[in-house]
UniProtKB/Swiss-Prot annotation:
Signal sequence segment: 1-23
Organism annotation: Betula pendula (European white birch)
The protein's name: Olee1-like protein
Keyword field contains RNA-binding: no
PANTHER family in UniProt: F28N24.16 PROTEIN, PROTEIN DOWNSTREAM OF FLC-RELATED
Keywords for the protein's UniProt record, in alphabetical order: Disulfide bond, Secreted, Signal
Family that this chain belongs to: Belongs to the Ole e I family.
InterPro entries: Allergen_Ole_e_I_CS (IPR006040), Pollen_Ole_e1_allergen (IPR006041)
Length: 166
């Protein structure tokens, strides 16, 4: 009896781990959308998070850029979105992009060719991240005109407002 337990226990552990390793992957992409009240294209103390903004997740083939997976989401009252994603997308480039603003006065997306307009995320178990949650960088829409208090807020950060505000 004792010998059979000694043999069965490691076998059971091994089979459990094997099943876990080959289980279907499920990820959750989380991020925030903000209104860039200072047109700096980064979060400041004057930025506000946007309820009802729409974002899109797209995973494309690395070779030809063919769309493999797509999902849309909307932010909650804290400006946060959460997109469930089934499957491992190790061989694809996955990015979150702004789709639609919930505020007509804060709906501009930068046209600067040097700026990234999306947040790239890794949706695979083979990257050393142990949790299924993937955090994307914050994405922001810009206000049409910066708030008057932006210059002071930027000086507090040690920045020259004329160099930063677009």
């Amino acid at each position: 009896m004792a010998k059979s337990i000694i043999i069965q226990a490691p076998a059971l552990c091994f089979l459990s781990l094997l099943g876990f390793a080959y289980s279907e992957s499920r990820f959750f992409v989380e991020g925030k959308v903000y209104c860039d009240n200072c047109r700096t294209q980064f979060v400041t103390k004057l930025s506000t998070y946007m309820k009802g903004a729409k974002v899109s997740l797209e995973c494309r083939n690395r070779e030809g850029g063919t769309l493999i997976y797509s999902s849309d989401s909307e932010t909650d009252k804290s400006g946060t979105y959460r997109i469930p994603v089934d499957g491992d997308h190790e061989e694809e480039i996955c990015e979150i992009a702004l789709k639609k603003s919930s505020d007509p006065d804060c709906s501009e997306v930068s046209k600067d060719p040097f700026l990234k307009k999306s947040a790239r995320i890794s949706l695979t178990k083979n990257n050393g991240i142990s949790t299924p949650v993937r955090l994307a960088n914050p994405l922001g829409f810009m206000k049409k005109k910066p708030l008057p208090e932006c210059a002071k807020a930027l000086r507090e950060l040690g920045m020259n407002p004329d160099d930063v505000i677009q």
